[in-house]
Amino acid sequence: MILLQHAGLPPPKRPSSSPPMSVAARSTGALQLPPQKPFGQEASLPLAGEEEPPKGGEQDTALEELCKPLYCKLCNVTLNSAQQAQAHYQGKNHGKKLRNYYAANSCPPPARMSNAVEAVAAPAVSVPPQMGSFKPGGRVILATENDYCKLCDASFSSPAVAQAHYQGKNHAKRLRLAEAQSNSFSDSSEVGQRRTRKEGNEYKMMPNRRNMYAVQNNSAGPYFNPRSRQRIPRDLAMCVTPSGQFYCSMCNVGAGEEVEFRQHLESKQHKSKVSEQRYRNEMENLGYV
């Protein structure tokens, strides 16, 4: 080695100290294995965000037509913003009506309805169609107080929103106005009934006044009877004077109307006079007088 260094020649290469590689190891090192996937992703399973294609395409398209971004035709609710629409479509009322819709059509509901709520930049609010044309399975779902206020013409997305509306000032003001209108209508109807009754009484009194004037103008002689056309009952025929008045000779009392005269006949004074007269007649018949 010293001689080689002096001569300027490079030293010979020494063999490496690592053991020789076996044939199996060489063959393994020569093969290129594919990169392994992390644990849990060996099988091609669908992720949580992915959705399976819905079954019953016709029914899903009909349901998407019912559930518009700002109008839910299934619940008959008009929505004002995308946040309110999202809250409505995720609420209990919409879920219940959705289950009823699928039950009426005898089709299992999907796990998730796609494209139900979409972000709308400039929504064009359209007039909702009439509910009479829509008949899902021949079943009509009526709106409740938690869905719609008929007095204020307002729709709600949840019972909490409905409760807040019913406790607000606007609803209370509308309620007071409605009560005032109903009271005024009832008062006006009562006044109208009173007027009709009064007019009827005045109309009845007018012919009587005309008859009185005619009697005064057409009276001729002391034997004129203005009640000649009036029907006189048989039991009172002997108590009517030629002038048409009723007269009680026993009590020396007269009356112009039949009702007043009958009241006199049923009075205690008249009955006492009648009993006295009977007693006198009986005594005369017996010869005591």
Curated annotation (Swiss-Prot):
Residues 180-191 have a biased composition (Polar residues). Pfam families: zf-C2H2_jaz (PF12171), zf-met (PF12874). A zinc finger (Matrin-type) spans 70-100, 147-177, 246-276. Signal peptide: none annotated. One of its GO terms (biological process) is protein transport. GO terms for molecular function: RNA binding; zinc ion binding. One of its GO terms (cellular component) is nucleolus. Keywords: Apoptosis, DNA damage, Growth regulation, Metal-binding, Nucleus, Protein transport, Repeat, RNA-binding, Translocation, Transport, Zinc, Zinc-finger. InterPro entries: Matrin/U1-like-C_Znf_C2H2, ZMAT3, Znf_C2H2_jaz, Znf_C2H2_sf, Znf_C2H2_type. Residues 9-18 have a biased composition (Pro residues). Residues 1-59, 180-200 are annotated as: Disordered. It is found in: Nucleus; Nucleus, Nucleolus. This is Zinc finger matrin-type protein 3. It comes from Bos taurus (Bovine).
